Amino acid sequence: MPRFVEVFGRLAKVAEDEGVRIAFENCDMGGTWNRPKWNIAHSPRAWEMMFNAVPSQVLGLEWEPCHQLVSFVDPIAQLRKWVGRIYHVHGKDASVAWDVVREQGIRSGINFVWHRTPGFGDTNWIDVITILRQGGFRGSIDIEGWHDPVYRDELEMTGQVYALNYLKRCRGGAFVANPLS
């Protein structure tokens, strides 16, 4: 953590002075928290270490449920705990083939998890949006769909539009201004 403190302690100070925030994506990028290939910020244990080492509120997370599901972490419980540190959200989901996991385990070489476009995965996005709103999040959910094994290439835009409409329904539909405000 000394190198993290050295680098991100300085960057946090600059961000504070400029009025901006720094968000780490919760993706392992092929590594683990203690042997990262690219990204230290993929697990709650790492987040605790990072935010304790540099306690600035300008440091937070770019969060998406996909990376939690593929690690068998409950994204809803995690979001409830960390919502105050969520500064950006990716709309990316995952599907877990629990029948394959139960029969073959996770080291059989048989694929058991897929990154999915919102609306085609296992995440309850109504809960995600509710928790984000209750936690004061006012940002966007940026749909990340090219990973989807079905809605990619020539079907990517179809998946993106479906996800946009799905997420709008999950938030309660089209925005309607309160006439009493």
Annotate each predicted stretch with a short phrase:
Residues 153-176:
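C-terminal helical cap(s) of enzyme catalytic domains, especially alpha/beta-barrels
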Residues 33-48, 67-138, 152-158:
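Gly/Pro-rich active-site loop or hairpin
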Residues 2-13, 17, 45-49, 77, ...:
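Alpha-helical scaffolding segments of alpha/beta enzyme cores, especially the outer helices
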Residues 22-24, 59-63, 87-91, 139-144:
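Hydrophobic faces of well-ordered beta-strands that scaffold small-molecule active sites
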Residues 144-147, 151:
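Aromatic/acidic polysaccharide-binding cleft in carbohydrate-active enzymes
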Residues 1-60, 70, 178:
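Active-site acidic/histidine proton-transfer and metal-coordination neighborhood
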Residues 26-30, 65-67, 95, 147:
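Active-site-proximal loop/turn and secondary-structure-junction residues that shape catalytic pockets
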